[in-house]
Structures are given as C-alpha cells and as structure tokens.
C-alpha cells in the first residue's frame, strides 16, 4: 500500500480504502470486527482517514501509521441479506463517515439490499449522498435503481466485459434509461477488475485478455453509439467521481 502511494506520488490520484469486506470473509466469533465494540472499531477506521493507514492493515501485533491516508470507507453485504456482522460494519462505516466526511463505497452481492444498506447508514448517522453502491448492474431493475437514486445515493456500473453476469448492451441501455430521467449526476462507471483475470498484463503468458482499458476503448464507445453525449460521459467518468469521492470538511 505504501509502495503504491510512493510510486504514484505526483503522477495521479489513488484513493486508498479502509473498512471491511462482506461478512463471510470474517469469523463471526473471533474476528476483530466481531469481538471489538463498534465505537472502538470506528476509532481505528477514523484514524486511518485522519492520521494514516496502518502498514499491517491492523493485523498486529502493533500499529504503524504511514503517510498514506484512507480516502474511502468500504463495507459489504451478502446476497439478499445483511448479516449481523455486516450490520456492524455498516454502523462502523457510517460513524466513520460522520466523523471524517469520508465517502462510503459499498459491495453489494448481485446488486441486492441497496435500500436496506441506505437504511443502515442513515440510522447510524451517515449520508446516502456520500454513499456509492457498486455492482448494481447485476440487478437490472430500473425502478429499483430509481428508488435508490431518489434517496441521493450514487450507483456504480462497474462490470462491462463480464458477460457471464450481464451483457454490455443491457448495462448501457439501463444507463441510458437513467440518464433520460435526469440522474446523470448520480452515476459513476468503473471496472471491477481487481483480480488477476481482470488485468490483461497479468495474463500475457496465457494469452490475450482485456484489462482496465476496456472501459474506455469498448464500453464508452458503446455509450456514444447509443447517443450519450460527451457532457454526460464526462460527468460519469470525471465530475461525479470527483464529487462523491471528495471528503466533506
């Protein structure tokens, strides 16, 4: 993490993440998230935003702060359920957001539980307006999208090039539908390509694959073919991320 921050210093903006993945990644009986009081866990997250991220990701046996500060809080939920552990992580995220002004980025399983996520965040003092719900293309319900956007949240469509889930044309058509209804300020685009199979450079020894550039070289041109204006494309790629991922002071 620190190596990445130093390597790209002065070359671009990298937003580091604090927080938790969905609950299934943690032991419900012995993990840090499960055993430590919510407000104490939140203090550790707040420190990663305000002071610097721990070099060892809080794996112990001591905390060593770095110069790199977190700029986004992550939490995650399961398919059609928010487990007790995930509710706790959402409470931690909301408390951290309230104290730091840092945005929340949510993993959703197949785009489910979006409304319930916002309920949990708001209940604990967080803001839907500073919350991004990711992987939403996997649940292609346009009116469900509208109900979430009407609460001020941002939706991220982040899986073009993953036809096993949804085809690019369907994702693009749903984006167009939302744009036609005035939601252009609440949509961001991305590539959920954190694993090796999503990074072309890691697969050169195997064969040809698309990487992060697919968003700009294939998906954005598809939006243009569907008559999405350059202004709206710029909003989704530049302005909206800049706004929602800014830290409120």
Where are these regions (language model features)?
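Helix-coil boundary/capping segments in enzymes
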Residues: 1-36, 128, 135-137, 168-169, ...
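Active-site gating/metal-coordination segments in enzymes
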Residues: 10-15, 20-103, 154, 160-164
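Active-site beta-loop-alpha junctions enriched in small/polar residues
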Residues: 19-23, 78, 109-111, 136-139, ...
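Histidine/acidic-residue-rich catalytic or RNA/ligand-binding cores of hydrolases
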Residues: 26, 113-121, 141-149, 165-175, ...
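Catalytic pocket-lining loop regions of alpha/beta-barrel enzymes
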Residues: 94, 98-180
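Divalent metal-coordination and catalytic microenvironments
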Residues: 97, 155, 192, 233, ...
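Short acidic/histidine-rich active-site segments
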Residues: 105, 158-160, 183-206, 233
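Mid-to-C-terminal alpha-helical segments outside catalytic/metal-binding sites
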Residues: 213-249
């Amino acid at each position: 993490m620190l190596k990445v921050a130093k390597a790209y210093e002065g070359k671009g903006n990298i937003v580091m993440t604090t927080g938790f993945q969905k609950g299934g990644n943690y032991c419900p009986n012995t993990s840090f998230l499960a055993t430590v009081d919510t407000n104490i866990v939140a203090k550790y997250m707040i420190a990663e935003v305000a002071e610097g991220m721990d070099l060892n990701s809080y794996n112990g046996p001591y905390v060593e702060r770095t110069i790199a500060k977190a700029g986004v809080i992550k939490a995650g939920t399961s398919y059609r359920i928010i487990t007790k552990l995930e509710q706790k992580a959402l409470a931690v995220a909301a408390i951290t957001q309230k104290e730091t002004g840092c945005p929340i980025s949510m993993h959703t399983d197949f785009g489910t539980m979006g409304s319930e996520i916002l309920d949990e965040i708001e209940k604990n003092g967080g803001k839907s307006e500073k919350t991004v719900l990711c992987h939403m293309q996997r649940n292609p319900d346009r009116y469900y999208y509208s109900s979430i956007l009407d609460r001020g949240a941002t939706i991220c469509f982040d899986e073009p090039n993953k036809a096993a889930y949804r085809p690019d044309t369907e994702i693009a058509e749903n984006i167009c539908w939302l744009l036609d209804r005035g939601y252009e300020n609440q949509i961001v685009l991305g590539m959920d390509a954190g694993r090796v199979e999503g990074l072309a450079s890691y697969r050169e020894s195997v064969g040809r694959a698309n990487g992060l550039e697919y968003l700009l070289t294939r998906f954005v041109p598809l939006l243009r073919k569907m008559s999405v204006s350059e202004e709206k494309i710029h909003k989704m790629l530049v302005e909206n991320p800049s706004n929602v991922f800014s830290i409120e002071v």
